[in-house]
Amino acid sequence: MAEPASAETFLLIDGENIDATLGGNLLGRRPAPEERPRWDRVRDHARDVWDQPVRGLFFLNGSSHLPMPFVQAIAALDFRPVPLSGPPEVKVVDIAIQRTLEALSTRGSGDVLLASHDGDFASQVAALVRAPGRRVGLLGFRELMSGALTELTAEGLELHDLEDDVRAFTVALPRIRVIPIERFDPWALLG
């Protein structure tokens, strides 16, 4: 049976968090262009995972500078750039994503994929996960996701690793993570 015409996935990208996690936690420096996620792959994964159209919203902090070439590239990939501004002490991207998640909860329809590691969204994500008939997923690096978010997997939150599941990168990232024994390959160590 086909999905209703109104079925769609809302893909919310916390651009600041993904970039900071990649640079600060994994690379220890600003990522080079070839080390950044391929956002078209993220969009395609979001479409394919639940086999329905995707509405991509890419949240950016534009308080001090808006990288127009990047914004134009994101728009060309069918994301809607959401540049935000505010005082330096205000986490404008977090506030906007929280409000969007709350609005989606009130809306009552639409599946949600959130690309972030930030536990500040836990209460809004929990409300969506607990809503009947709604699918909710988190995109990021599993080992760096907030425990406040990952504990929601017991209630149905799906985790999608940006490197392993989404294949959003064209280079291998220097990650240290637990390897499920069924995926352990000694040849990867022996090279």
What name fits each language-model region?
Residues 1-91:
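Domain-level signal for Mg2+-assisted phosphodiester chemistry and nucleotide/NA-binding surfaces
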Residues 64-191:
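Nuclease catalytic cores that cleave nucleic-acid phosphodiester bonds
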